[in-house]
């Protein structure tokens, strides 16, 4: 890996030497000084063999059992190989896996590793990037504490700094990860070289980092032109670390990576891990593999059969499935679990599985971007449409597609024939002034940075790291992720500018935006310029302005060239605040976004066009449907036939009436001429208009004659008058005698009443609640006095404590009690007895009505029986309510108030009385119902009245209970409030004590006053009882007075009735003489009426017969006219139907044609729906996306993902997984071994970030839109823990292969150490400023040899 610049001087490091040399501490004083240190030398001993190991990666807690087994085998190999003192062990870094996190276990296993190796042979050790925090070189590395403080390692030499180190016949040129200067072979001077006396002496370079063209474990070639294998020229051997793959870097095989001792991931091969043995004298080397029973292995399962693969005893297995279902896959796992102790399982499906190929014999692998025209045809066939419809839809699609393509050439890509406009543009230069927190003249020239490198932007908080991203977005799209557009201008400046130089192929473009703050300071005017830059043969550049008519059109042109703002946020811009992650999108957003980047939006345009066209066609079809109506051609023919038949019937009827009926009627009329009517003068006063009136007149005369003949009744009337007068005299005489006695008795009673009224005592209005209130107030005053006494007692004993906690408790108690108060009213309940009396009276009436109904002599009909049953139900409902009320009253806590207790007992007693009466009635009613006996009575009014009274009683009782409960609660509130007031007012001072003394005195006075009031009220209560007794006597007297008054009134009424009867009879006798005269006259009129009746009957018969036939003739003429009119109307209808038939035939043909077209468009709209053909096409891309995403994930994590979508062939697999598919959705599941897949929405922060990053990179790769050459990640790594952070190097190495520039912004030290280049930000006078750093190892190579300091 490339290193960052360092201006710090090397720090002290302690090195351990053998007995032949002494220990030394060294410190270089100049950057140009090179340390030369003799570790051990006796001028005789020669080192002939070096056992080279690297990249151990001991983890904090994981895989320790595996490491111990491998270490034990390593020790055995080394002990068998090393039998003399001519061998050493070299460790080239990355002993630890996590540089900043340690544990007791990792210290134990590491120190034991060093100790055992040191006992076998001398050890030369250099640090790796995983052993130290390179972003903060002042921090202690992870190895020093173990080497210096755990054990004494006499033969372990930790070469932490760059320099030259002599060990017997070897000079090691160490280039440390802490420094950037490459220690080349020419740094070893002849003077030092000649001092080595051994005949075989060697220059060996030790370096931990990537060398150009080194191949990583995942197959990626390192692009690090700053450090080539040729730069180690002059060394006999170069021993490298950092790359986990064993490989030689030159043809002579003198430069090599030993690879990782233990396999680290699935990307590494199962074999090729161990110790690289260098034979220095023989100039050869060989890899001694160390067996590992664990290991990562990849197994393919094709057509349900596992391809033979070498598997260790305790493997971590990654399965790649081809044409294999879940059942077959599970069978393979079950078989392997019987043979091996599987540690981990990762499942991955390749493209063949996604496309459901039947066997691997199908070599034609489906491409991601197949011709969509073929898919249109196959989708039609899949929907089961007939050949004619399919052909019509395909022709319609071609027509619509060509029209969409012609109208929207700039917006829609020709995906039908794979004519895409995909292009990749390169960011060359960014310039900006006074943008956000920055000042003037800031430049980032990306042409200065080598491709496939990590560019880090590092600075303290609030320096503007993330602002660089917003400036790039603003310059490209005229918008940024934070704030408003006007906020892009620095708040302290009046103008700003930013520009981007980019290229597409050889063509360069220049985008410039200039902002000026308006005079009011509230708005900012921003202009945009867009240029293309061409270079002629002489190298002269020419800028051509590409601006549109206005700013919006210019922005559209830029977007057409480089793409959409939202696409960039989802692919190459990972922002800190608005991280538009694909997995966070809704289902609709996912499909819309994929359609957009894959240029499937043409189908949405086709769908919208067809949908609008369908609306127009549907409207036209409705108009045609209204024209043809609901009738068919047969209906029209039937109507014509029906009208013709009706016209024939009408003609026949006209002929029959005119030719036959009318002549016969005229003959009858002529035979009945008009006859004159006869009248009598004596009868002119009577109403004789018709036969009924004549008979009625005769009847009246007979009745009058009958009344006149009652003359014999006059004598009877005279006798009755004499008898009644005698009776009147007797009653009057008797009443006169009794009246005197009664009036005397009445006077005495009135006198007694007046005397009793005088005895009544006038008392003030008494309120029982007021007495209780006074008593409660007295109790509260006494409680308050007790509290004050308690306070005095506490104060006198100097034992007062903090009252605040008690105050809080009291406040909380008061609040709870107040919330529990029920709502009541202050109505007077004295009329409760009256309500119960009214209820009893109503029940009495009710029973009387029912008793009338329950008549045993009458048999019930069904209606009467139903009515009685309804009455029983109603009465039972009210009886049940009374029982419930008694239950509530029974729950009342008695003993608190005698008045309430008496009232409740009284109410319950009356309720029980009513309930007993009702139960008796129910028994009687049941008997009558069983005997089918009933009566009919209307009791609705009584029931309503009874219900109203019971509801009033219920409300009163409920209100009484609520009031009593409220009184108890209010008492508790007052008590707590009294204590609270005392605590709140008390401060412990003398003044407050005096106030309490005064308060106590006032309270005592108040108690005396209230007790007097209570005594007065109790006396008033006694007087009230005396008054009640007197009133009772007065009521008895008034009752007797009413009885006497009633007797007098009854006798007087009887006398008046007799007098009236005598008067009426006497007037009857006076009228008797007139009756005789009237009787004679009535007899004459009656005889004359008999004669007139016969004459009138004869006249009326003749006349009515003529009128009847005249009316018949008129009716026939009218009917004849109606028939003629109806005949004309039918003729008009017949003519209209003929025209309608002609129009119908024309409209029907047009309707059928239009209906076929509408049906075609309906199918087309359904097919082009977002869940139709576009979704089917999208499913062809999803396996590719899934495969690419999993390929990225496997280099970082131990899980993979799967895209879930509806597919008939996958239903069985979905059932096995117990998952639900949705045709209209694109779901993502996370898959771990031995775990059911779960939705990514349930994933952890780390899982979501890694999956989002992998999807982001994959979408950027397959996008059919324009894409840039860079990826920007702003603070996205904070969710990684220590174990996952250790894989950052691997992740970065992979990302660099995909993008020309990877820009990272982070505060994590692990991320800072990954940067190949650093863009620093400084602040000058409150303005941020860009500072570019670009120092690499390559620059140091060509320097002159530095000064050597020998130790």
UniProtKB/Swiss-Prot annotation:
It comes from the Viruses. Residues 19-31 have a biased composition (Low complexity). Residues 1-31 are annotated as: Disordered. One of its GO terms (biological process) is double-strand break repair. Gene3D superfamilies: 3.60.21.10, P-loop containing nucleotide triphosphate hydrolases. GO terms for molecular function: ATP hydrolysis activity. Residues 1-17 have a biased composition (Basic and acidic residues). InterPro entries: Calcineurin-like_PHP_ApaH, Metallo-depent_PP-like, P-loop_NTPase, Rad50/SbcC_AAA. PANTHER family: ABC TRANSPORTER ABCH.3 (PTHR32114:SF2). This is Uncharacterized protein R555. The lineage of its organism: Viruses, Varidnaviria, Bamfordvirae, Nucleocytoviricota, Megaviricetes.
